[in-house]
UniProtKB/Swiss-Prot annotation:
GO CC annotation: ribonucleoprotein complex; ribosome
A Pfam family of this chain: Ribosomal_L29
Source domain of life: Bacteria
UniProt-listed NCBIfam families: L29
Entry keyword Ribosomal protein: yes
A GO BP entry: translation
UniProt-recorded Gene Ontology molecular function terms: structural constituent of ribosome
Source species taxonomy: Bacteria, Pseudomonadati, Pseudomonadota, Alphaproteobacteria, Rickettsiales
UniProt source species: Ehrlichia ruminantium (strain Gardel)
Protein name: Large ribosomal subunit protein uL29
Keywords, in A-Z order: Ribonucleoprotein, Ribosomal protein
Family: Belongs to the universal ribosomal protein uL29 family.
Keyword Cell cycle: no
C-alpha cells in the first residue's frame, strides 16, 4: 500500500484497515507456523503497512493537538 493512498483515507477508514491488517497478520503468522512453504515476505509487508497507517494516524493526532 502506498503512503499517498493511506493519506487520502479518513481516520475511520484507516482504523478499519488497521484492524483488518492486524487480523491478516495473525493469520499469516499462524500459517507460517504450520506451513513452511508460505511466502515469508508477505508478513513483513503487512507490518510495514501497519506502521505506515499508525504513523499517519499519529501525525493527524499531533496536528489536532498543535492547533
Amino acid at each position: 500500500m502506498d503512503i499517498i493512498d493511506i493519506r487520502s483515507k479518513t481516520n475511520d477508514e484507516l482504523h478499519e484497515l488497521l484492524f483488518n491488517l492486524r487480523k491478516e497478520l495473525i493469520d499469516v503468522i499462524l500459517t507460517k507456523k504450520l506451513d513452511k512453504s508460505h511466502n515469508h515476505f508477505y508478513g513483513s509487508n503487512i507490518k510495514k503497512d501497519i506502521a505506515r497507517i499508525l504513523t499517519v494516524l499519529s501525525e493527524r493526532k499531533n496536528e489536532v493537538k498543535n492547533v
